[in-house]
Amino acid sequence: MLEPNVLVTALQDLRDNGFLSDALLRRAVKDIAAADDRFDWVGVYLVNSEENVVWLHNYVGKPTPHSKIPLGEGICGTAIAEGKNATVPDVSAVDNYIVCDPRVKSEMVVLIRGDDEIFGLIDIDSRTIEAFTDEDSEAVQMVTDKLAEQLAQERS
């Protein structure tokens, strides 16, 4: 089970010691992936507004051919385009689902957002149908809020 307070504290420690967003993003993905057996693939995508895509920064899990996803396509691109998190209990029910691994049954996307900007998202896939709970989403949101603080600071 993800313990968001522990991870948020670790991310803040990295910030306090001068580490930049790259280190925080990698730590978040690694720790989220290790936190729960239901989390079969965890990755972070960042927004590239010039190309109108999200691009894969780093991940833990099976390699994916989808290093760039157009905004508005798939669960990740749609979450960014609509500006809201997404929890999909059964990916086979989603018309524009982009298959990375045919064994994936459910997916959760939590945006990394600052006040007026969406920086990216954390994407979590599971081979279990209906794998994700509201508590999972809330826990990951605590982590993405901390990541957003760092990304906003670096862009200011």
Question: Regions from the language model: what does each represent?
Answer:
Residues M1-T64, L151-S156:
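Intrinsically disordered, low-complexity terminal regulatory regions
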Residues D36, V99-V104:
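Short loop/turn motifs at secondary-structure junctions and domain boundaries
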Residues W41, V109, L121:
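Short hydrophobic/aromatic beta-strand element in the GNAT-like acyltransferase core
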Residues V47-C100:
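Regulatory sensory and allosteric helical modules in signal-transduction proteins
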Residues T87, L111, D123:
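Conserved beta-strand segments that form the floor/walls of ligand-binding pockets within enzyme
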Residues S106-R113:
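A short, aliphatic-rich beta-strand micro-motif
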Residues I118:
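Glycine-rich acetyl-CoA-binding "A-motif" of GNAT/NAT acetyltransferases
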Residues S126-S156:
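Juxtadomain coupling helices with adjacent low-complexity linkers
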